[in-house]
Amino acid sequence: MQLIPTSIPEVVILEPRLFRDERGYFFESFSEQRFAELVAPTHFVQDNESRSSYGVVRGLHFQLPPHAQAKLVRVLRGRVLDVAVDVRLGSPTFGQHVAVELTEDNHRMLFLPHGFAHGFSVLSEEAVFQYKCDNYYAPEAEGAIAWDDPALGINWGLPAEAIRLSAKDSKHPRLSEAPQLFNYSTTLHL
């Protein structure tokens, strides 16, 4: 597995080493020891999976302390544009985002530490998406910002007429209006 940096140092891409032959392929999708060597010691406690169809945009979600979640995400089937937005007040990259294409063919994973809002858009007919989280889901700690906040300038890779949102995701506040965010001084710095 190799680490690929992004424009925000704490958000990193992980690319596994594939072994291919006439039967197909094999790769180690996760090793806690290797992850700690490359990124940081992290103990994931919950795996989630979602299935979505073309045009779906999910996000931008996060959980607030003490229930904050770091996530390691990947696509099992299909193709998505995965987005991480820095929501750490005082961070030199506050309000900036990283957008990475994750596919069933590139097998890449994206790591988002505490202090980042997460979302993705589905670019294929269907996508099956997996999240590893270092904290359990806590509905009372849910936070979110608007997927289409003009201050973020996110290009979701979809025509406007194709975008499909849940009722909940269509009502999130802009980053500047979010009632609670993270403090940069209390989050992981790589």
Region locations from a protein language model:
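Short beta-strand His + acidic residue motifs that chelate non-heme Fe in jelly-roll/DSBH
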Residues: 110, 118-123
